[in-house]
């Protein structure tokens, strides 16, 4: 009898978990709806940290009056997700949580633009095509879904390219604040020149150039990314391919670049970097910001995010996230003499490698 009861409890638990998977598609849809309505921004700009439901509804632009009764239903779900706090004693009021603040437009540490990129139909189409991709002979699920590689698609579709660049710029704003903070103290000290490879719109390089006025910063990226961007002072933009020619500098920055490429291309790029930097005695180094895969983190959510990022890289770019041993192998194959993991930046780490 006890055994039957245990089986019943396990079945009930399993069913609850399966319903969580079944309904999980609604999570990003509800968050996207909140962003489209401007709810995080409205709560952020409100004079009082707690905003009543009636005031929130009144502040929503273009809301059909017949749909106002849906807003508390939406907010209840978003409270469940941890984006907002609910204050019943303050007249059904709401406030932003730390996670919710990350969805405020132009927030220094926000990931709003990255979220919107992840919800773009082209990206969702890739995820929906994994089953078909496993049966065909194409290199990535992105090609299965959209007929060309991610990079070729960016070059051919200005709208998608803009959404992608906005996502990278948003992430760069977050990373640039970390790079010039105490947690990365000393990384740029003593350098006279730096090339930010694949630096996009230049958010990271701008922050570094501003924090270190005597450091010349060069952003190297493809012509359709650089477009008509102009540098000033100690900041310069150069259009070109990192696999062709890299401007000479003390140091090179590779932020979230190497995980886009397979081992062979990574070694090729790292060799190019080694040719373009000063000797170790003269401060030469390559600064890498990328993920180090570990399964022994105490943070289960962090491990799960790393596993999902690894899956994304494989289906989108035919690349992968790497363990420390896999990183070390790449560095040695490219001819570098050593490396040092400087600090952890949440999901990613900062690594210095030396010629």
UniProtKB/Swiss-Prot annotation:
It is an enzyme of class 2 (transferase). S-adenosyl-L-methionine binds at residue 221. The keyword Transferase applies. It holds the Pfam family Methyltransf_2. The keyword Signal does not apply. GO terms for biological process: flavonoid biosynthetic process; methylation. It comes from the Eukaryota. One of its GO terms (molecular function) is rhamnetin 4'-O-methyltransferase activity. Its EC number is 2.1.1.-, 2.1.1.82, 2.1.1.155. InterPro entries: COMT-like (IPR016461), O_MeTrfase_dom (IPR001077), Plant_O-MeTrfase_dimerisation (IPR012967), SAM-dependent_MTases_sf (IPR029063), WH-like_DNA-bd_sf (IPR036388), WH_DNA-bd_sf (IPR036390). It catalyses: quercetin + S-adenosyl-L-methionine = rhamnetin + S-adenosyl-L-homocysteine + H(+); kaempferol + S-adenosyl-L-methionine = kaempferide + S-adenosyl-L-homocysteine + H(+); myricetin + S-adenosyl-L-methionine = 7-O-methylmyricetin + S-adenosyl-L-homocysteine + H(+); kaempferide + S-adenosyl-L-methionine = 7,4'-O-dimethylkaempferol + S-adenosyl-L-homocysteine + H(+). Pathway: Flavonoid metabolism. The active site is at residue 259. SUPFAM superfamilies: S-adenosyl-L-methionine-dependent methyltransferases, Winged helix' DNA-binding domain. Optimum pH is 8 with myricetin as substrate (in the presence of S-adenosylmethionine). Keywords: Methyltransferase, S-adenosyl-L-methionine, Transferase. Transmembrane segments: none annotated. Mainly expressed in leaves secreting glandular trichomes types 1 and 4 and, to a lesser extent, in storage trichomes type 6. Belongs to the class I-like SAM-binding methyltransferase superfamily. Cation-independent O-methyltransferase family. Flavonoid 7/4'-O-methyltransferase involved in the biosynthesis of polymethoxylated flavonoids natural products such as myricetin derivatives, aroma compounds possessing antioxidant properties and exhibiting pharmacological activities such as anti-carcinogen, anti-viral, anti-thrombotic, anti-diabetic, anti-atherosclerotic, and anti-inflammatory effects. Catalyzes S-adenosylmethionine-dependent regioselective 7/4'-O-methylation of flavonoids; active on various hydroxylated flavonoid substrates, including myricetin, quercetin and kaempferol. Homodimer. PANTHER family: O-METHYLTRANSFERASE. This is Myricetin 7/4'-O-methyltransferase 2. It comes from Solanum habrochaites (Wild tomato).
